[in-house]
């Protein structure tokens, strides 16, 4: 197990464009992270727009919305147009599109947004993908190489919410079969909550001084899938069993759920890497950036109890 600890940041006062002369664009508006970030921005009275392929500007949502499709360059200009009396968009939360070769598209949009006056980008990546690596790693490297812009890259480990969001396979297996499935064996990992990712994102999006670095975001404890099953059993009052699959069996399970073959192989490979110790590490980054400890899996499961029926 690797433990990395950073000195706590002093809390920054104010936002990077003072007097709210900023509007933040949240891509991936229907995803796990954007909704949590939106709540934090709304509470802080920071103007923002939520964007996704299915966003409807005329909807009754409490948030301003705009349509954005990574694959449709015609939406790029519209999504960067601020609403009503809002200031121009100065900051973007970048959530990668669900495609294999995502870097060229994301880099093209970053360039387009930069020409339109966007000054800061915060990228959602993954704990196992380093700068210069595949997919988001290429975007990470590009952001770090640009002069004249501010950036941060968030690299969270596996989400706790993968067990609780409505259409997640793990949630359905818990609810309907009293089982969870993995190819991680007895490997340990520090599951992190989307709520904690959002708190770090809020700081990197709004702090007056840009972070200009990447953060590996981990939960507070190393646990196995067997321990996840034990915790769920305790919280739910019924036995939840961890079914240990081979990598090939997990690929087949994911493909049977409708996942494209390339994505299924990639995710199953990441799962197997857990058994080899790829996620066996802890740090204090969440507290370092936000000033508060990340939530435990027990706390998460207790609050999400109703979702598993």
UniProtKB/Swiss-Prot annotation:
The pathway is:
Alkaloid biosynthesis; ergot alkaloid biosynthesis
Alphabetized GO MF terms: oxidoreductase activity
Q: Which reaction does it catalyse?
A: agroclavine + NADP(+) = didehydroagroclavine + NADPH + H(+)
Native species: Epichloe festucae var. lolii (Neotyphodium lolii)
Describe its assembly. Answer: Monomer.
Alphabetically ordered keywords of this record: Alkaloid metabolism, NADP, Oxidoreductase
Q: Which Pfam families match?
A: NmrA
Role: Agroclavine dehydrogenase; part of the gene cluster that mediates the biosynthesis of fungal ergot alkaloid ergovaline, the predominant ergopeptine product in E.festucae var. lolii. DmaW catalyzes the first step of ergot alkaloid biosynthesis by condensing dimethylallyl diphosphate (DMAP) and tryptophan to form 4-dimethylallyl-L-tryptophan. The second step is catalyzed by the methyltransferase easF that methylates 4-dimethylallyl-L-tryptophan in the presence of S-adenosyl-L-methionine, resulting in the formation of 4-dimethylallyl-L-abrine.
Name of the gene this protein is made from: easG
InterPro entries given for it? Ergot_Alk_Oxidoreductase, Ergot_alkaloid_biosynthesis, NAD(P)-bd_dom_sf, NmrA-like
What EC number(s) does the entry state? Answer: 1.5.1.46
What is one Gene Ontology biological process annotated in the Swiss-Prot or TrEMBL record?
Answer: indole alkaloid biosynthetic process
Q: What is this protein called?
A: Agroclavine dehydrogenase
Keyword Isomerase in record: no
The entry's family comment says:
Belongs to the fgaFS/easG family.
State whether keyword Oxidoreductase applies.
yes
What induces this one? Strongly expressed in planta but weakly expressed in axenic culture.
């Amino acid at each position: 197990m690797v433990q990395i600890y950073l000195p706590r940041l002093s809390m920054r006062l104010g936002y990077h464009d003072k007097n709210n002369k900023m509007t933040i664009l949240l891509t991936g508006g229907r995803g796990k992270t954007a909704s949590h970030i939106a709540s934090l921005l709304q509470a802080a009275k920071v103007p923002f727009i939520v964007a996704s392929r299915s966003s409807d500007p005329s909807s009754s949502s409490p948030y301003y919305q705009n349509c954005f499709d990574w694959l449709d360059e015609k939406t790029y200009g519209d999504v960067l147009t601020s609403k009503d009396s809002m200031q121009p968009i100065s900051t973007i939360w970048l959530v990668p599109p669900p495609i294999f070769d995502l870097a060229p598209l994301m880099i093209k949009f970053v360039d387009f947004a930069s020409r339109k006056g966007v000054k800061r980008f915060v990228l959602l990546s993954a704990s196992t993908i380093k700068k210069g690596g595949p997919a988001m790693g290429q975007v990470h490297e590009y952001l770090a190489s640009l002069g004249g812009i501010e950036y941060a890259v968030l690299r969270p480990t596996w989400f706790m919410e993968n067990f609780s969001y409505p259409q997640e396979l793990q949630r359905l297996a818990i609810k309907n079969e009293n089982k969870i499935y993995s190819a991680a064996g007895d490997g340990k990992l520090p599951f992190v909550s989307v709520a904690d990712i959002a708190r770090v994102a809020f700081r990197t999006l709004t702090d007056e001084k840009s972070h200009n670095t990447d953060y590996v975001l981990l939960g507070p404890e190393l646990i196995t899938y067997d321990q996840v099953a034990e915790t769920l059993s305790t919280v739910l009052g019924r036995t939840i069993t961890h079914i240990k699959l081979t990598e090939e069996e997990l690929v087949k399970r994911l493909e049977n759920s409708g996942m494209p073959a390339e994505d299924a192989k990639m995710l199953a490979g990441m799962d197997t890497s857990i058994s080899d110790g790829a996620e066996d590490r802890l740090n204090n980054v969440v507290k370092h950036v936000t000033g508060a400890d990340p939530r435990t899996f027990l706390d998460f499961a207790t609050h999400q109890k109703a979702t598993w029926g």
